[in-house]
UniProtKB/Swiss-Prot annotation:
Any GO molecular function: acetyl-CoA C-acetyltransferase activity
Active site: C95, H351, C379
EC id: 2.3.1.9
Residues the record lists as binding CoA: Y187, K230, S250
Family membership: Belongs to the thiolase-like superfamily. Thiolase family.
Coiled-coil segments on the chain, per record: none
Keyword set includes Cell division: no
Record localization: Peroxisome
Main location: other
Name by which UniProt lists this protein: Acetyl-CoA acetyltransferase
Positions bound to K(+): Y187, A246, G247, A249, V347
Role summary: Essential for n-decane utilization.
Lineage of source species: Eukaryota, Fungi, Dikarya, Ascomycota, Saccharomycotina
Organism, scientific name: Yarrowia lipolytica (strain CLIB 122 / E 150) (Yeast)
Chain's gene name: PAT1
GO cellular component terms listed in the entry, alphabetical order: mitochondrion; peroxisome
Length: 397
């Protein structure tokens, strides 16, 4: 007897929103990761026009969950006013977390397990605590920064993520000048995008209540005040003889982002707007010290699944954990840098680690034109990466 397998459901993006990205201890420092996630999720759902009772699950990425409370993704659901019947799962794939949620949402929809999923990422690096060990009886106690411990430290080689990038730069011959020039261009693109309102369709303002009234944050905070000459004069951070500086690396930030992923059948049934179709996705891994080049492995895998080549791709979003990361992957993939991070990247806009994968995805969805293909990819600690291929469409295919 021959079995007939059911046709897989196609997954579509029907809503997308992100908060502005705040500086470390900046405009968003008083807002928790949960509240940032709620802001992004509510806006994405509102824009999708999907009734809240039609949502099956929330998948939310967060890396620095310490002191956020139990089940952060579930808190976004309950505190956000969504039905208690909506399931929720928190995802930690380090910096890939927010993009992995989109891939997992697409998988569940293709399998027929879910019809509508809110996939996002959130991080408040300004609100992360310090750790102290238990059982102190007498004497001094050392504190550990949870940002470094759980987010920015390679536990396999016992070095900072920045040292991994230094290793890549030396091996690939990437110079300090190349990294600085790349960073300066990222800042230029970001500031130009802010000035021209290029982010207005993706950003939802964050309202902060203070004793003096309500403060509204509506623009990315990090790019403002960038100075090319000062950037070129900064000293290396991780290796005195190295080339990675605070200026050509991504900063520490706060922010959240979310998309609503729906099956084509459900999107038609609900009459939702359609923003893009998820074509394929892939993960790839290599040695932990080489996490920097992992996107160059995940991207070809995703393209192969889509039946596409790099020449079919109109725009790329490759997360700029460091300028050296972007340069190393562009070199390996042979991509035209004029098509990469056209609105500026994480070096300029910021890198709230649990949210960044979703942020670049939302930016890509908004940047593409009808019928164009785009790729979003991001590396993560441990030597891995996630990549997603999408097609810009305005209706279910």
């Amino acid at each position: 007897m021959r079995l007939t397998l059911p046709r897989l459901n196609a997954a579509y993006i029907v809503g997308a929103a992100r908060t502005p990205v705040g500086k470390f201890n900046g405009a968003l420092k008083s807002v928790s990761a949960i509240d940032l996630g709620i802001t992004a999720a509510k806006a994405a759902v509102q824009r999708s026009k999907v009734p809240a009772d039609q949502i099956d699950e929330f998948l939310f990425g967060q890396v620095l969950t310490a002191n956020s409370g139990q089940a952060p993704a579930r808190q976004v659901v309950i505190k956000g006013g969504f039905p208690e019947s909506v399931e929720a799962t928190t995802i930690n794939k380090v910096c890939s977390s927010g993009l992995k949620t989109v891939a997992l949402a697409a998988q569940a929809i293709k399998a027929g397990d879910r019809n509508v999923i809110v996939a996002g990422g959130m991080e408040s690096m300004s609100n992360t605590p310090y750790y102290s060990g238990r059982g102190l009886v007498f004497g001094n106690q050392k504190l550990e920064d949870s940002i470094v411990k759980d987010g920015l430290w390679d536990p396999y080689n016992n070095i900072h993520m920045g040292n991994c990038c230094e290793n890549t730069n030396k091996r690939d011959g990437i110079t300090r000048e190349q990294q600085d020039e790349y960073a300066i261009e990222s800042y230029r693109r970001a500031n130009e995008s802010i000035k021209n309102g290029a982010f207005k369709d993706e950003i939802v303002p964050v309202e902060i209540k203070t004793r003096k009234g309500t403060v509204t944050v509506s623009e990315d905070e990090e790019p403002k005040g960038a100075n090319a000459e000062k950037l070129k004069g900064l000293k290396p951070v991780f290796d005195k003889q190295g080339s990675v500086t605070a200026g050509n690396a991504s900063p520490i930030n706060d922010g959240a982002s979310a998309v609503v992923v729906a099956s084509g059948t459900k999107a038609k049934e609900l009459g939702t707007p359609v923003l893009a179709k998820i074509v394929s996705y892939a993960d790839a891994a290599t040695a932990p010290i080489d996490f920097t080049i992992a996107p160059s492995l995940a991207i070809p895998a995703a393209l192969k699944k889509a039946g596409l080549t790099k020449d079919d791709i109109a725009l790329w979003e490759i997360n700029e954990a460091f300028s050296g990361v972007a340069l190393a992957n562009l070199m390996r993939l042979g991509i035209d840098k004029s098509k990469v991070n056209v609105k500026g990247g994480a070096v300029a806009l910021g890198h709230p680690i649990g949210a960044s994968g979703n942020r670049i995805f939302v930016t890509l969805v908004n940047a593409l034109k009808e019928g164009e293909y785009g790729v979003a990819a991001i590396c993560n600690g441990g030597g891995a990466s996630t990549a997603i291929v999408i097609k810009k469409v305005s209706s279910v295919e």
